[in-house]
Amino acid sequence: MGDEAAIHIMGAGLSGLAAATLLARAGKEVHVHDVRADSGARFDGDFQALENWSMDEDFFEQLKEWGFDASEFKATEFDVVDLIHPDDKITQATTSKVAYRIVERGTSEHTIDQGFKRQALAAGAKIHYKSRVKEEDCTIIACGPKGTSAVAYGEIFHTDHPNHIGFQLNDHLAPGSYSYLIIIDGVGLICTCLWRKQKKSERFLNETIAWYEAHYPNLNRTPIKRVGGKGDFTINRNYKQDGRYYVGESGGLQDFMWGFGMRMAVWSGVLAANDILGKGDYEADVRKHLMPYVRTSVANRWLMNRVGDRTFKRMCTAWMKDQKKSGDGLIWIGNLFRPKWYKSILYRLVSPFMLQSDPKAMGRGVRRMPFRKALKRDVWEQSEAANAVGAQWDAARRKGGKTSFADDAETSKDEQSEHAISS
């Protein structure tokens, strides 16, 4: 890139901007490059969750310690979450702490993407949008998904329903995964995640919306747009190679089980910046602080791939039973996410069979979780209620409603969406 003193970062997402902010504050010349027109441009106003149960320390306290201002973006806190069982029973997980923070992704001023962008610019970093650079010319690689391991489809809508979160485990509506309802200040999102590739995938979203409308009759939903997302889940042999730091999704630093990734994205950007500033060893710090959680999530995903609604029901029942005993709805789910010795053993046993080598990884030894095939139980026709939801969306689309995914294409195709799933 000409000037060896300058630090060039590929990707103006959360991990790249986090690193850029700390480096620029330390007096480094920092250039961030992104092929898109703005930070958050690959999202479309999607709501995403910052979970707060996998670690003892609150994520916003971590942000403060690292020097980031969380007031730069809108985050809505929840201490109650509807837990929806596969048999349609609705219970509530409650805590005296913060269970979730919901943030919006995209280019609006209040999004987390723009909040981190403003902090990077204020620190003195220069951001170059619509700028293509080569990986070998950059110090930090902070790109989004390249392959596809899972997808998510959602509908954003207007509603007069109060702020609310619902989290549903249902293998019929969300194969191998979950669906959710998020309502923030008059705008709602119903989303289903698919960890098995499907044909005519829009039926899963239609059926999921129909389910929520039947069980939350006061939604008063007016569709705005439909959005899609994909997740790319990888394990890297090296996180620093040939002088380059691979952060966030480029480093495979996210949750394989349910797709949470924003916390590790920011954290990995911080660790990369610290290494460059002589305050740490990125490879060692990633393996110490982040990889135990990633390996645990791989073991969890392997288990999730082998169960269905019967086990999902047991999980929901155990969660509520533990909450009744402990008085805190975060303890059970926190234990599921936190590293355990037996999950470390399970990871070593199953990862060779669960992950496939990526021949285009520039010698980094990247192994990717493939998008699993559909099962026989995934083949079904929409209900009348789902057909009505689809017809409602068709009417909204004719009036200008936009959609960011193809209706009938098989969901394994990368071109179906450029958004990211829960990260």
Please provide the spans of the model-predicted regions:
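Active-site-proximal substrate-binding core of FAD-dependent oxidoreductases
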Residues: N274-M315
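N-terminal FAD cofactor-binding segment of flavoenzymes
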Residues: S39-D82
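FAD/FMN-dependent oxidoreductases across multiple families
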Residues: A75-E77, E202-R287
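C-terminal auxiliary extensions adjacent to catalytic cores
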Residues: T311-E410, D414-S423
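Glycine-rich FAD pyrophosphate-binding loop
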Residues: A24-D46
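N-terminal Rossmann-like FAD-binding beta1-loop-alpha1 element of flavoenzymes
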Residues: A6-H31
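Active-site flanking residues adjacent to catalytic metal/cofactor-binding acidic residues
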Residues: M10, H33, V247-E249
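Predominantly flavin-linked oxidoreductase catalytic cores and closely associated redox partners
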Residues: H110, Q114-P223, G231
